[in-house]
């Protein structure tokens, strides 16, 4: 594929995606997937396993599409396309930017419920060579097209969860029936609740696996005009494959509810954990650990064109092993975005030169499920000897969707960025403002602009300068980073242009091995949670003829199907919101 043909896509601006404005159906443009053995255009850096999930690949005209396994409903196929704010499907535009690294497996299928276990991924290659052996399906349930909730019925491969026993449990049940649904789970206890749903501790019948199931009431969402928020969260979760972000194991719906099945984090959230610390604050070493993992998660989200917009300790969950996981994506903003690779020396000098393809692919570390589009200019192609191949400068991944704009007033008052309060429109820089508030709270035990009420808090955010108390004492590096993040003008805020790359290089994170953060020892390991009493009480309730009342929940407020005490104070110290 000639990269020169894509030079005009380098300056494509970020646009907020509106997934509910499809045009009239065009049955002739139904999407289909390429098989790895088909005549895929040859390219020395073409990797069908690492491509952009937002743009559909268009095969050569001579290539006949394989028989579709998704049915022939062209309207359903059209709903699978990604739509821009002007209503056009990005997949159907004739001038849509082509992507060298498109992966058909990252486009999640619409109506099929057949997929495969990540733990069996290594065996999948051998099975495909033998036509006599059938693949073991993994069923995640079908999606309905009503109420604007459309999308995938099964998850793509998640490389970092390849050995996850929860996938094995899901697959063992999926192989026995047509699809996974609410009847396959027992809801043991309500763990938390939020604006669009409640989260329950659930075990998968016939296995020893437990999950966190987010249940959203359809009628409540429709009456409060929040269907789009539920759809956004589900779509974003289906894209994620990162150790500090949640894995969507299954999605299904009933007549009354939408259900998302995710990982159960027994360690609670960082807000609760901070309350248990001496003086209700973390040490600088512990704060650096949690901030580094959150920073990597935000960087990955920005690579995908996702602005998180709801960072706060309550949304940072602690896994069993002590590492963190971001949660609650219903306020997030999706946009089209093309990350690029640049030389660090050029960025620092303001040159912003883009690397040529060969050096960028071979010399840059990138997430296992994402390979950014390479956008070389004429200058970098002609002056190949000047691209820094023989120098000591290392490449940087520029993954900051600075052009995206939203006018929504969303977030928690103490964490709202000034540009949101002023109604000026906001972009990815709001995540770096909230990251500064987050770091301040970890170190000081409170937020910097908190007032007597919400109105006073908003006034302080916009009009009051940042101040540090005399105690507790924090390092000058920590204060300097927080000052850079809490600049009220988003254009002057640290990381506005270079994103997480600039923050990683700050002295506060000196000594952090970013490639091995996942292997670092956490400052706190949660105590094991004994789930036996909940399961035993649940079985006792059923044996007394109570029936499976947890699977017959009423609309909002949802019934707390807890096996045991029903008061909220008795719940496990865990919130998903």
UniProtKB/Swiss-Prot annotation:
Keywords: ATP-binding, Kinase, Nucleotide-binding, Serine/threonine-protein kinase, Transferase. Its EC number is 2.7.11.1. ATP binds at residues 191-199, 214. The active site is at 310 (proton acceptor). Residues 44-55 have a biased composition (Basic and acidic residues). Transmembrane segments: none annotated. Disulfide bonds: none annotated. Autophosphorylated and phosphorylated by PDPK1/PDK1. Residues 510-577 form the AGC-kinase C-terminal domain. It comes from the Eukaryota. Specifically expressed in pollen grains. Residues 1-12, 69-87, 110-120 have a biased composition (Polar residues). The keyword Transferase applies. PANTHER family: FLIPPASE KINASE 1-RELATED. Belongs to the protein kinase superfamily. AGC Ser/Thr protein kinase family. This is Serine/threonine-protein kinase AGC1-5. The gene is AGC1-5.
């Amino acid at each position: 594929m000639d990269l020169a043909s894509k030079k005009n896509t380098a300056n494509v601006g970020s646009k907020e995606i509106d997934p509910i404005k499809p045009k009239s159906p065009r049955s002739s443009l139904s999407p289909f997937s390429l098989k790895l053995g088909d005549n895929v255009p040859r390219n020395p850096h073409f990797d069908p396993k690492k491509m952009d999930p937002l743009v559909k690949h268009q095969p050569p005209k001579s290539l006949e599409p394989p028989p579709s396994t998704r049915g022939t409903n062209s309207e359903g196929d059209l709903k699978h396309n990604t739509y821009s704010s002007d209503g056009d499907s990005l997949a159907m535009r004739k001038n849509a930017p082509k992507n060298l690294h498109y992966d058909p497996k990252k486009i999640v299928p619409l109506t099929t419920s057949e997929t495969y276990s990540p733990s069996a991924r290594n065996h999948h290659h051998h099975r495909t060579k033998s036509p006599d052996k059938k693949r073991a399906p993994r069923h995640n349930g079908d999606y309905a097209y009503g109420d604007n909730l459309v999308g995938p019925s099964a998850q793509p491969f998640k490389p970092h969860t390849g050995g996850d026993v929860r996938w094995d449990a899901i697959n063992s049940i999926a192989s026995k029936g047509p699809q996974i649904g609410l009847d396959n789970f027992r809801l043991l206890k309500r763990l938390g609740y939020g604006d669009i749903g409640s989260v329950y501790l659930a075990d998968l019948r016939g296995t020893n696996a437990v999950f966190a199931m987010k249940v959203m009431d359809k009628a409540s969402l429709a009456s409060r005009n929040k269907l789009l928020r539920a759809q956004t969260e589900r779509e974003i979760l289906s894209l994620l494959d990162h150790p500090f972000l949640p894995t969507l194991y299954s999605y299904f719906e009933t007549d009354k509810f939408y259900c998302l099945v995710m990982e159960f984090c027994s360690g609670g959230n960082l807000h609760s954990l901070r309350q248990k610390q001496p003086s209700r604050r973390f040490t600088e070493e512990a704060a650096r650990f949690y901030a580094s993992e959150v920073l990597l998660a935000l960087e990955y989200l920005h690579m995908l064109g996702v602005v998180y917009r709801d960072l706060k300790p309550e949304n940072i969950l602690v896994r069993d092993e002590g590492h963190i996981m971001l949660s609650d994506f219903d306020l997030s903003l999706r946009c089209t975005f093309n990350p690029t690779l640049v030389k660090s020396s050029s960025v620092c000098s303001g040159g912003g030169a883009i690397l040529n393809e060969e050096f960028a692919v071979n010399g840059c570390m990138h997430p296992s499920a994402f390979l950014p589009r390479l956008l070389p200019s004429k200058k970098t192609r002609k002056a190949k000897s000047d691209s820094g191949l023989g120098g000591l400068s290392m490449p940087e991944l520029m993954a900051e969707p600075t052009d995206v704009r939203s006018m929504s007033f969303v977030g928690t008052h103490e964490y709202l960025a000034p540009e949101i309060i002023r109604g000026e429109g906001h972009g990815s820089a709001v995540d770096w403002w909230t990251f500064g508030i987050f770091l301040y709270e970890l170190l000081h035990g409170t937020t910097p602009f908190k007032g007597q009420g919400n109105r006073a808090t908003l006034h302080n955010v916009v009009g009051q300068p940042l101040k540090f108390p005399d105690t507790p004492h924090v390092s000058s590096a920590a204060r300097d980073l927080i000052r850079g993040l809490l600049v009220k003008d988003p254009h002057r805020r640290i990381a506005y242009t270079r994103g997480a790359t600039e923050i990683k290089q700050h002295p506060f994170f000196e000594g952090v091995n970013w490639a091995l953060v996942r292997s670092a020892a956490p400052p706190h390991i949660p105590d094991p949670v004994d789930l036996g009493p909940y399961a035993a009480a649940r079985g006792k309730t059923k044996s007394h003829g109570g029936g499976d009342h947890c699977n017959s929940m009423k609309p909002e407020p949802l019934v707390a199907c807890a096996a045991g005490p029903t008061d909220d104070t008795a719940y496990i110290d865990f919130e998903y919101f």
